[in-house]
């Protein structure tokens, strides 16, 4: 049952078609990389949940709720809806097993999804365990989670992938 999930998350064994677009991660030295690109490149440490050739998922260190995950394309683009259609499809397929793992790992009604894109100029999806719509209120105060708590959350989600 878990083998298809691991196959999908592992680009070497995935039988899903990769996005056909010729988008590539930005390599220009003229513009600074976004914080998400620096996380993907390993310049900034993160609590990685999953990764494949095109996408990267990691914990938000200022979570709305415990289990808040960010899913980002490795290609830098400011607006999620500027991605080619095949990338949009693939990012949701990449996020789906992570969302299901979040639902299993935390006491919630479902995993909420949000696309806002105002704080970081790099397309991303928020996956948040929720019990009601107020749990996705990004105006509420958020505090930085401790490294110990983030590590526990990371392990909890990964255990359900």
PLM features: what roles do these ranges have?
Residues 2-9, 30-161:
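HIT superfamily nucleotide-processing domains
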């Amino acid at each position: 049952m878990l083998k298809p999930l691991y196959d999908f998350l592992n680009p070497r064994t995935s039988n899903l078609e990769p996005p056909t677009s010729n988008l590539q991660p930005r390599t220009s030295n003229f513009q600074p990389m976004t914080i998400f690109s620096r996380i993907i490149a390993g310049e900034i440490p993160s609590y990685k949940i999953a990764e494949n050739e095109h996408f990267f998922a990691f914990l938000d260190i200022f979570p709305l709720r415990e289990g808040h995950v960010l899913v980002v394309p490795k290609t830098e683009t400011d607006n999620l809806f500027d991605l080619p259609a095949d990338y949009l499809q693939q990012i949701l397929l990449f996020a789906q097993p992570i969302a299901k793992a979040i639902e299993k790992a935390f006491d919630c009604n479902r995993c909420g999804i949000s696309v806002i894109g105002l704080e970081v100029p790099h397309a991303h999806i928020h996956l948040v365990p929720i019990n009601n719509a107020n749990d996705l209120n990004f105006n509420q105060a958020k505090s930085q989670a401790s490294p110990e708590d983030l590590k526990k959350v990371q392990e909890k989600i990964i255990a359900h992938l």
